[in-house]
């Protein structure tokens, strides 16, 4: 199964806007370990759910609600398209540089022309030549929705600090697979300019100093202390 729908924790600004509209009882309630619950959910409009069609005695008609039924190989291809090319690499690139530039919202980063161009070029120019095409979803339509609808959405208050969590565990799959695909297909790796810049940016991020020379706290990561000792 592959599901793709970002649902951040309840946001105080969304609660305020709901209250302004006369909707009562929308208070956010803190929970253990920094979690929170609320009667509302701030989530994306765009959503994907792909399920392996491997039922023993019929299956519910979830396709009527937009669910994609496909074989296991296709589910894997959809996951690779998303994780290696069309969404997750862009997310990680934005999170690293967003933290260093003082952003706290992904949607605000998308208003920065340089950052927007940065992820567009990573996706369209460097990663798409080796994208895994699952057939049932168009990679260009998928990444177009990411850049033009999902990331700029101000009502989906996702933060670069959240996305930057465990970055050391994500770099290999989100960028290494593209580099390996270039090697396997005999493509010119010198065309990869911005993906190496993401990796260099991560080394800079690990220092915990933002673009104004002020200290910031990197997001939690199992290798944080080890990597900070190296850089």
Language model features: what each stretch is:
Residues 1-231:
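Substrate/ligand-engaging "lid" and interaction regions
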């Amino acid at each position: 199964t592959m599901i793709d729908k970002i649902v951040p924790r309840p946001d105080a600004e969304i609660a305020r806007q709901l209250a302004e509209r006369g909707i009562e009882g929308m208070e956010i309630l803190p929970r253990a370990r920094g979690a929170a619950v609320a009667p509302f959910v701030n989530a994306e409009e765009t959503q994907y759910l792909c399920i392996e069609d491997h039922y023993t005695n019929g299956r519910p008609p979830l396709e009527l609600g937009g669910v994609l039924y496909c074989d296991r190989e296709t589910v894997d291809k959809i996951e690779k398209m998303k994780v290696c090319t069309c969404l997750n690499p862009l997310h990680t690139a934005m999170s690293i540089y967003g933290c260093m530039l003082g952003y706290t919202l992904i949607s605000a980063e998308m208003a920065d022309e340089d950052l927007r161009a940065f992820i567009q070029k990573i996706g369209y120019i460097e990663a798409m030549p080796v994208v895994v095409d699952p057939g049932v979803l168009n990679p260009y339509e998928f990444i177009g929705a990411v850049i033009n609808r999902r990331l700029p959405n101000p009502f989906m208050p996702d933060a670069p600090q959240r996305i930057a969590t465990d970055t050391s565990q994500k770099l290999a799959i989100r960028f290494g697979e593209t580099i390996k695909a270039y090697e396997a297909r005999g493509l010119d790796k010198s065309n990869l300019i911005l993906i190496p810049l993401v990796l260099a940016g991560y080394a800079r991020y690990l220092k915990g100093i933002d673009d104004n020379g002020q200290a910031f706290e990197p997001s939690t990561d199992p290798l944080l202390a080890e990597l900070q000792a190296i850089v």
